Amino acid sequence: MDKPVVRISVRNLVEFILRSGDLDNRGGSSDREAMQKGSRLHRKIQGRMGSHYRAEVSLKYKTEYEDVSIQVEGRADGIFTEDGQCWIDEIKGVYADVSQLEKPVKVHRAQAMCYAWIYAQEQKPEKIGVQMTYGNLDTEELKFFREEYTLEELGLWYQNLLDRYHKWIAYQLAWKKERNASMSDLEFPFEYREGQRKIVSGVYHTISTGRQIFVQAPTGVGKTMSTIFPAVRAVGAGLGENIFYLTAKTITRTVAEEAFSILKEHGLKFKVITITAKEKLCFCDKTECNPENCLWARGHLDRVNDAVFELWTTQDSYDRDTLLEHAKKWQVCPFEMCLDLAVWVDAVICDYNYVFDPNVYLKRFFGEGTSGEYIFLIDEAHNLVDRGREMYSAHVDRADVLEAKRLAGDYSKGLVRALEKVNRQLRTLEKECTEYEILPNPGAVSLGMLQVMGEMDKLLEELHGKELPEQLLEFYFCVRDFLNIDELLDENYVVYTEMGEGGKVILRLFCVNPAANIHRCLEKGKSAVFFSATLLPMDYYRALLSTRKDDYGIYVTSPFRQENRCILTGRDVSSRYTRRGYEEYHRIASYIARTVWTRKGNYMVFFPSYKFMEDVLEVYENEFSAEWVRCISQTSGMNEREKEEFLEEFSASEGTLVGFCVMGGIFSEGIDLMGEKLIGAIIIGTGLPQIGTEREILRQYYDKKGVNGFDYAYRYPGMNKVLQSAGRVIRTQEDTGIILLLDERFTGKDYRNLFPAEWSDRGNCTLNTVEEQLGSFWNRIREKN
């Protein structure tokens, strides 16, 4: 049997094995201007060296181990001969004053040494030299560092470097054999529910063919296990490399962790990590990742490889508590250790942004030029539309530019000049803007922001180790975001200006259709599964989440008996803005009262906004309160503890509890209140988003595309919130409950066409008949039991 071949670039090898020192995020990033300047500087230096200088020489060398071949490859910046001596040149562009550099950076020297060793295998010289050339990106001033090595010295050094890397590869290969063997008899851990087998086979086939699939399956089918199980089997069969389970909310990450745990209880060996937000993993009050403010950042790079290797080789599940405990033991940053460990595991559970967000994505997996046989399982995929628009949009506010200019005065005249230029450009746009103004492109602002970024990067490098005002640093990230999105502008964007609250103009790059950007990310892997209980209408979600024409689609009907739940539409009530007022609030409050009086138990009432909820709640408490009914309400900005306390009320309640909530909020999706914990959901209105600039831009954009702009901007997003809220009731085969839709618009064809197939038994009611109809349903349930 042939040995596997592992390929790694020279740069990745030395930056992984030889990294050392502190973690420090105070330096600048590689912005477009710096990269362009660096490329120009490389070409200039290479051009000056004469005909004897060979630039960009491709080199590779394979080293044989008993279990694996490791091929190290890359391109040397330059190779030349001087006085009979061969030299390998490594060129680095920096903003720092090169005259102040005392010695080359360790990993830069190591890159040159690797190239020297590989090149020497062909030429066999007695000695070979390495030259580190540092050039200032602005002044183009150069400084050279030279060192000579014998072939024996280089050989010993290179072998030691590769042996340290081989340790990781050897364990990885041994683990994969053990992992794959554990799957030989792995079966689905439960008796298949109706629809589950259809999902499992559909997902496995999709992965095996390298395609994408959209799975619409109602709450309670068991979508999590039905997608994870076939993905795991596909990895074991060599059809995929890593699983990325992507979620929008913390609670769905927990469900995924539980699914993997159940499979492990049935014999699966699989390493699974959950990436938690940096703020939730940080030991410090503020996430200031530098050696002055964080003990864990000090010397982090000296210790992190040993920390990761120990955790990786001794455990298989890595949740927040495990990561924090291990990071404390090794005195390293838990978040950075988590990201490093993620490279070596079998499955990563994380938020959408670690794959899709251009500012946050895992560069270890999805950086430029990197890809793999990744399987993407995208949970609650309906959320990815708005999240995608948010991740791929950016803005610059003239008020922020002026504040940054004020703060920059103490640091850099060049930055002040660049900011004033952008300010003038925005002021010109401001004069032409009333409510909002659609533009063909950002115009000169893009170039101005590029110059600002260059000046800020220069400043950050010069100030290395010193603090900048927090507001100025935040503006730096705003500029970076703007430039990243500016590169993506195409027909899927609308560029527009609007007036901010402070009377200053805001220039926005608004992604109206995120499908192309999402597609570019998913192309880094092999296959993707989009699944949700509310992917209706499926064509809408396909249009906004995928550009492929060959995607599969599966519709799974509810496995639960229709007779266990009652769905009614109140046809004499409305939540339209034109109807809002005491009379309608009183009617809605009366509906709520008559519903909860019909049977003792727990109910949730979902409103389109906090204001609407508060207005109806006030009427309800003043005119319909009863001793045996207790009301609680969702508040804006609830933290995790408050959210848990709210949900605990539904477990502890023995009488009748009514939770007043907001559609599209934290209680309208991703929560499990089974059995008697929740027996009814009352949904007020059609969930239409509030009319605003971006919604109107969406409506106009899709009207021009020849589809119904109102549907795309308002009706479909609103109906999704309705379906999610309704999905809180009936979570298991034994559950019984009612769903009450309070808005006359639900009786119209435009909305009826959006109802899932299992709502075919939906009936209509009025305020005068609702008690009788619900009472009849509950009597049937009592008689059956």
Where are the predicted features?
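Conserved pre-motif I regulatory segment
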Residues: A174-Q216
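Mg2+/Mn2+-dependent nuclease catalytic core
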Residues: Y61-G155
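Signature of the SF2 helicase/ATPase Hel1-core->accessory helical subdomain module
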Residues: T227, T254, K328-A347, D351-M456, ...
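Metal-dependent nuclease catalytic cores that hydrolyze phosphodiester bonds in DNA/RNA
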Residues: M1-Q85, A110
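Walker A/P-loop
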Residues: S208-P230, N242
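A contiguous, basic/glycine-rich beta-loop/short-helix subdomain that forms a polymer-engagement track
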Residues: L323-V348, N359-F366, K458-S574, R579, ...
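Conserved RecA-like P-loop NTPase helicase motor core
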Residues: R571-E583, T635-F746
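A substrate-engagement module of RecA-like helicase motors
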Residues: L186-E187, L239-V348, F356, R424-T428, ...
